[in-house]
Amino acid sequence: AQIAAFAPVKEQTAWTAEIGTRGKMGWASWDIALYRANIKREMLQFTVGRDIPATTFNADRTRHQGVEAAFSAAPTDWLRFRQIWQYSDFRFVADAQYGNNRLPVVPKHVLRSELRLGNDDLHIAPNVEWVPQGAWADYRNTTRTTGYTLLGLSAGARVMAGVDLFIDARNLTGEKAIGDVSAAILASTASAIYHPVERRAIYGGVRARF
């Protein structure tokens, strides 16, 4: 059996700045935040092998910066649009080994949108999750996962006061894609570090409130 060698690590420290806005104007509302964190000795993990626990090491300097933005619009009682956008720029900073490479696992852009038609008595809501470009799989930035688009649909109906029926259909088109990654130092498409998105699935049930 393989045994991973112990690598001593030091505590990480960081300076973080964040600015944002939250508000409502008429039938539209928003919540936007911009952030930046400069980190020293960030503790990063990478996969050694399938049967070996992930190993942790200290990076020299890294930077996490990005935008988290949510927007909602409800022009009528029966129509509501919601959208969430995440922009993530996580990278090494002038690292001796990795230069300014991006950190793996987290994709650069993620967009989630939902359009709800109806009210609490009866509604249907198509939704989409779009990752235009997948995340890097390794710290050397040699292998990147592909982007994907997941389509879903949810619906609900009120049977009586406090009792609702619901249905949640996910990945309607049966999209096959990589949804998560266990980071590696150097990866290939054959590396055992990839985890798929949820397969096509339909859930339904009853919610009761007392």
What does each model-found stretch correspond to?
Residues 1-4, 42-50, 88, 92-100, ...:
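Outer-membrane beta-barrel translocator domains and adjoining extracellular loop/strand segments
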Residues 3-8, 16, 52-58, 66, ...:
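Extracellular loop and loop/strand-boundary signature of outer-membrane beta-barrel proteins
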Residues 8-65:
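Membrane-embedded beta-barrel scaffold of Gram-negative outer-membrane proteins
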Residues 13-17, 24-26, 61-65, 105-111, ...:
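Residues that define the transmembrane beta-barrel architecture of outer-membrane proteins
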Residues 19-23, 69-73, 83, 113-117, ...:
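Residues on the lipid-exposed face of transmembrane beta-strands in outer-membrane beta-barrel proteins
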Residues 27-30, 77-81, 121-125, 161-167, ...:
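Repeated loop/turn-to-beta-strand initiation elements of outer-membrane beta-barrel proteins
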Residues 36-38, 57-139, 173:
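Gram-negative outer-membrane beta-barrel transporters
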Residues 40, 130-137, 157-210:
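C-terminal beta-signal and adjacent terminal beta-strands/loops
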